[in-house]
């Protein structure tokens, strides 16, 4: 998590994710949060102004985490398809460890009335897509990834399929191993894009 946040803020984020996992985003209230942590609502307000600020902190946590994955893969000497495979597997690992992140990261419909949250999700998507696009374009130049499909379209296909796969896992009430089935799934995606 961000080095600038306090241990108490980390605890609030962690417990917020637990509440979201059990009750959905609607169940994340300052009252429920204070009760679960075991202190007053006023104590929560000392760290975060409101529920929106907590959700922003969760999205920032995810952004930092995924940004690290994407930047590390950009620096990697592996080929483009291996980089894409690692990106998928890192996302599967992150979501498996914290399933409630899916409810926040893929919740733009719920956030539609909160511009700051929509902007935060859009920022994450844009940054991740830009880095993925760089990996794809590099792979196309090296003939590792098919070049008969526009790189922007491939990025949308890859990101969209990742999202759909993770949402299916969530909608099945996490009934299968995301990392195990995800490993098989990413191999199929790689077959589709490989040159």
Task: State the predicted function of each range.
Residues 1-7:
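N-terminal intrinsically disordered/low-complexity leader segments
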Residues 8-16, 33, 58-62, 66, ...:
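Generic hydrophobic, amphipathic alpha-helix propensity
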Residues 11, 19-53, 57:
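Helix-turn-helix
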Residues 29, 103-105, 114, 147-148, ...:
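Short, hydrophobic secondary-structure boundary micro-motifs
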Residues 57, 71-100, 151-158:
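Hydrophobic alpha-helical connector segments
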Residues 64-67, 71-72, 97, 115-142, ...:
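Amphipathic alpha-helical packing segments from all-alpha helical-bundle domains
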Residues 86-97, 130, 134-142, 160-161, ...:
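C-terminal peripheral helix-coil segments that are non-catalytic and often amphipathic
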Residues 96-116:
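Amphipathic alpha-helical segments used for helix-helix packing
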């Amino acid at each position: 998590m961000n080095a600038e946040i306090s241990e108490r803020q980390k605890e609030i984020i962690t417990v917020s994710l637990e509440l979201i996992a059990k009750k959905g985003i609607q169940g994340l209230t300052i009252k429920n949060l204070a009760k679960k942590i075991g202190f007053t609502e006023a104590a929560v307000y000392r760290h975060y102004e409101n529920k929106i600020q907590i959700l922003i902190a969760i999205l920032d946590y995810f952004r930092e985490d995924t940004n690290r994955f994407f930047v590390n893969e950009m620096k990697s000497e592996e080929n483009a398809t291996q980089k894409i495979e690692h990106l998928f597997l890192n996302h599967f690992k992150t979501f498996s460890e914290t399933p409630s992140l899916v409810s926040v990261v893929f919740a733009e419909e719920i956030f539609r009335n909160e511009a700051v949250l929509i902007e935060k999700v859009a920022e994450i998507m844009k940054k991740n897509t830009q880095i993925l696009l760089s990996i794809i374009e590099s792979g196309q130049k090296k003939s590792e990834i098919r070049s008969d499909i526009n790189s922007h379209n491939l990025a949308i296909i890859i990101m969209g399929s990742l999202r759909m796969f993770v949402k299916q896992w969530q909608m099945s009430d996490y009934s299968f191993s995301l990392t195990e089935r995800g490993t098989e799934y990413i191999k199929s995606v790689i077959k589709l894009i490989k040159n």
